[in-house]
């Protein structure tokens, strides 16, 4: 039993080290073209503080952090998966029209601080008034906190 516990601990430590090794800083021009275009189009007025690639066994993702603290996460193809704009707001033209219309009708004037896209679930949205909304793939509200 002790050997099994030791083996589990060793594997855990090795996996943590492997994860740390697979996160590496990169230049924005080393990211997929779709991510570069997205940044140039929607965040042209912001300065990039750091970009990194996170490589895992079956997945690769990219993170960009701007000097004001805003952050974008991209999948391996360069499609955004999470936009976190705690210090500004998510650009309106990146929000799906159905979600944008819902927010305009029900939360007019409230900033959208974060939007996360999950291909299986839909979208999670955090508003400046503390409300969190979850939309399914058909853009219907399925949860609210």
List the model feature ranges, each with a label.
Residues 1-23, 39:
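Bacterial Sec-dependent N-terminal signal peptides
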Residues 21-145:
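Interaction-mediating elements
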């Amino acid at each position: 039993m002790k050997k099994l516990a030791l083996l589990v601990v060793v594997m855990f430590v090795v996996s943590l080290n492997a994860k740390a090794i697979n996160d590496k800083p990169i230049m924005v021009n080393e990211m997929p073209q779709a991510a570069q275009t997205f940044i140039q189009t929607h965040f042209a007025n912001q300065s990039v503080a750091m970009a990194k690639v996170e490589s895992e066994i079956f997945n690769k993702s990219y993170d960009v952090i701007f000097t004001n603290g805003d952050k974008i996460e991209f999948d391996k193809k360069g499609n955004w998966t999470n936009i976190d704009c705690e210090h500004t707001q998510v650009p309106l033209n990146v929000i799906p029209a159905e979600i944008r219309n819902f927010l305009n009708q029900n939360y007019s004037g409230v900033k959208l601080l974060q939007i996360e896209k999950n291909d299986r679930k839909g979208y999670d949205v955090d508003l400046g008034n503390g409300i969190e909304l979850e939309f399914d793939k058909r853009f219907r509200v399925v949860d609210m906190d």
